């Protein structure tokens, strides 16, 4: 009934999958130091950290909170995992990431697929749309998608350089992750980040041109599209761009 016990249960689950802290950090976007603090119960973890760890491990939302109050965190974690819908592919592939090291590219492909399976599993257990935490969880899963996309892109580059035959499958995983990211944004259709993401796709303009229009860099563009983090000075231009593209798109549809 403490952070130490809850963290120990999380660590045991990680180790049972033969994941290092670095593996979990790559899967969650949380620093290894932050994960170490959580597993040791050294500090009270931030809510977003807990959500990322739950998502990365494919655990139901609220798992960590349940472990904090459980008389036997290990037994409670086992119960929660057993209660999840069976997904043997995800479990097998997640284990394969570290254990079945036939080649570097096989590991990278397995890891990309495990990430996609884990994200889909989390989406299946999202809170109700009426929940106060619904948008927070959506943004958390989008962040996981973005992280997984960047890893898959790097994996594809490694596979190409190695002349591996997994490049096609990695590209399929990357496209699936991007489709998932877009679908998650569609769950918040009125948010400015979702509207901006749609506008970027509908405009047919190169990203560099859109960035020049609103006066931000490429990294800031990505943050706006996924996290809604908009520099104060760019906010009027972002809104103007979105309004212009939406009006043009609506006019085009009206003529069809």
UniProtKB/Swiss-Prot annotation:
DNA-binding region(s) from the entry: 21-40
Transcription as UniProt keyword: yes
Segments crossing the lipid bilayer: none
Limits of the HTH cro/C1-type domain: 10-64
Induction: Up-regulated 12-fold 7 days after infection of human macrophages.
Originating organism: Mycobacterium tuberculosis (strain ATCC 25618 / H37Rv)
Keywords for this protein: DNA-binding, Transcription, Transcription regulation
GO MF, one example: DNA binding
PROSITE patterns from the UniProt entry: HTH_CROC1
One Pfam family this sequence matches: HTH_3
Name under which the protein is recorded: Uncharacterized HTH-type transcriptional regulator Rv0023
